Amino acid sequence: MVIILSFALLCLLSASLAWIDIRHGIIPDWLNLTIAGLGLSKAVILGGPFAGLEAACEGAAIGAIFWLLRRLYFTFRKIQGLGLGDVKFLAAAGIWVGVAGLPMLLLVAALIALACAGVMQLAGRPLHAQSSISFGPYLALGLLFASGFQQYWLCC
């Protein structure tokens, strides 16, 4: 029951995140914190306090890695390649899927973003090297896919 309820809430929060990021180009801190808190609560309820600590450490490590990648990209290119809200979201997502689920999350997000960019290009919207897109909705879909896959895989 906890798994189903937490996943349903994650779906609702992810939809909110996608809508806000598409509309305003930001991912609010309160939303990232809510997703992180829900993931930590789920980990503690299902696995105990040490599972929550492990999930928190994995989320923090993932957030730190992507923050470093963001800084390195800016250092070399002098433009932002990944928003800070995306970095914080990846840290929160890391609590949900851990290091093991991160490749699936990123692959799904990148493939969906690439497909959408291709559709936009075919529809006549010109995309250039400096074009920016809101990556949060794609990360949210990647999180839902990776989390759903992990929960199904572990339950069945």
Residue ranges of predicted features:
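A membrane-topology feature that recognizes alpha-helical transmembrane segments
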Residues: 1-156
